[in-house]
């Protein structure tokens, strides 16, 4: 049997009618032992993993963004800290501000701190 190049195979495939293509597919499944249900199940697995969305986040202050005073005030108000504790926390950036908080709370904290020009990450 002569070896076909990819271009020759594609050209031959273009010339086939639907019935011939279906026979080719069935022959390939039989020849190589391909189980179509296994292929579908394997393809669906990554989609299921991607659907799982993270529900808790750690809020980390990366830097004060050059607006230290506003960030200290925001941290003080949002975390219920004293002024000195908030100042020490901001000055020790990067630092974890809150751990395992719900998505809504994490996004709210990020929005308010970003408004004060802080650099925040959620992970």
From Swiss-Prot:
> What Gene3D superfamilies has UniProt attached to this entry?
3.30.1390.10, Single helix bin
Please give the superkingdom of this protein's source: Bacteria
Q: How does it assemble?
A: Homodimer. Part of the ribosomal stalk of the 50S ribosomal subunit. Forms a multimeric L10(L12)X complex, where L10 forms an elongated spine to which 2 to 4 L12 dimers bind in a sequential fashion. Binds GTP-bound translation factors.
Q: Which HAMAP family match?
A: Ribosomal_bL12 (MF_00368)
Question: Which organism does this sequence originate in?
Answer: Metamycoplasma arthritidis (strain 158L3-1) (Mycoplasma arthritidis)
UniProt xrefs under InterPro entries? Ribosomal_bL12, Ribosomal_bL12_C, Ribosomal_bL12_C/ClpS-like, Ribosomal_bL12_oligo, Ribosomal_bL12_oligo_N_sf
Q: Report the Pfam families cross-referenced here.
A: Ribosomal_L12, Ribosomal_L12_N
Give the family, as the similarity comment puts it.
Belongs to the bacterial ribosomal protein bL12 family.
Q: Name one GO molecular function term.
A: mRNA binding
Which biological process annotations from GO are given for this protein?
Answer: translation
Keywords, in A-Z order = Ribonucleoprotein, Ribosomal protein
Name the job this protein performs: Forms part of the ribosomal stalk which helps the ribosome interact with GTP-bound translation factors. Is thus essential for accurate translation.
Task: Spell out the protein name for this chain.
Answer: Large ribosomal subunit protein bL12
Sorted alphabetically, the Gene Ontology cellular component annotations on this record are: cytosolic large ribosomal subunit
SUPFAM superfamilies xrefs: ClpS-like (SSF54736), Ribosomal protein L7/12, oligomerisation (N-terminal) domain (SSF48300)
